[in-house]
């Protein structure tokens, strides 16, 4: 297979610099583009390594599907500045879409989101007509459990490194309401007629098959559900899930 052109780059979002990895298809010429949205980090200081393996996925999409692919770190993770908030991460996704739109030969922009990144990708797609379609992998339908106790969530966010600035947020309760207000089921109907691809492992311990089914159904005829037998929550490490995702990308129609 041909090599891709890849570069480490940055994106500006609300004046915050986000770190990113862009992979370019080897064949050159017009091609569709996709932004890859990561989920929440886990473990102490996990934000520093958040999305560390996503550039590999971007490279593979560019190489095997012939797409422009962008793996970026939302604010508060990886090499990106800023602090986590739902509104901030949604702004970061919009900034990634704008970045891809500026590629001269990009033929439309799609989103791929994993875990919580998939949930926010659904919200972003519903709100932004520039986005041609969305794939959500192992994505929870809401963040209500996260937002139920804002103080505890903030403690977690500081522990993993998603929130670094003293005094942030100005209002813990308002910050928490932004988290608990996330509802992919309410957003999904607004995606149609653009496609929503929902991928779930049948052994996922965090998101159930029924959760995924309800999300796909919420998009009506635009929704498509695929299940990976025996796969857990870390779908991006399962070759069957990756193959299913790439098959979906191959079926998309560029502008």
Question: What are the roles of these predicted feature ranges?
Answer:
Residues 1-28:
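N-terminal cap/lid segment of alpha/beta-hydrolase-fold proteins
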Residues 18, 128-255:
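The alpha/beta-hydrolase serine catalytic core
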Residues 41, 74-78, 141, 232:
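Alpha/beta-hydrolase active-site loop signature
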Residues 53, 83-104:
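Alpha/beta-hydrolase active-site loop
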Residues 56-79:
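Conserved alpha/beta-hydrolase
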Residues 95-155:
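Primarily recognizes the serine-hydrolase "nucleophile elbow" in alpha/beta-hydrolase
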């Amino acid at each position: 297979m041909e090599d891709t052109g890849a570069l480490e780059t940055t994106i500006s979002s609300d004046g915050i610099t986000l770190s990113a990895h862009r992979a370019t298809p080897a064949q050159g010429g017009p091609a569709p583009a996709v932004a890859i949205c990561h989920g929440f980090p886990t473990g102490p200081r996990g934000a520093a390594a958040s999305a560390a393996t996503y550039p590999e996925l971007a490279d593979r999409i560019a190489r095997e599907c012939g797409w422009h692919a962008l793996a970026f770190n939302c604010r508060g993770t990886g090499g990106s500045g800023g602090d986590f908030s739902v509104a901030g991460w949604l702004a970061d996704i919009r900034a990634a879409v704008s970045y891809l739109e500026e590629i001269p030969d990009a033929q439309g922009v799609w989103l791929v989101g994993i875990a919580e990144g998939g949930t926010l990708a659904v919200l972003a797609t519903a709100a932004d007509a520039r986005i041609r379609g969305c794939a959500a992998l192992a994505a929870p339908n809401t963040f209500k459990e996260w937002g139920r106790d804002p103080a505890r969530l903030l403690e977690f966010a500081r522990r993993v490194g998603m929130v670094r600035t003293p005094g942030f947020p100005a209002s813990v309760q308002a910050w928490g309401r932004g988290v608990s207000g996330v509802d992919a089921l309410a957003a999904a109907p607004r995606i149609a007629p653009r496609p929503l691809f929902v991928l779930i492992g049948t052994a996922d311990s965090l998101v159930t098959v029924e959760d995924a089914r309800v999300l796909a159904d919420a998009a009506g005829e635009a929704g498509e559900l695929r299940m990976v037998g025996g796969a857990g929550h870390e779908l991006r490490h399962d070759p069957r899930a990756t193959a299913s995702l790439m098959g979906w990308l191959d079926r998309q129609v560029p502008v």
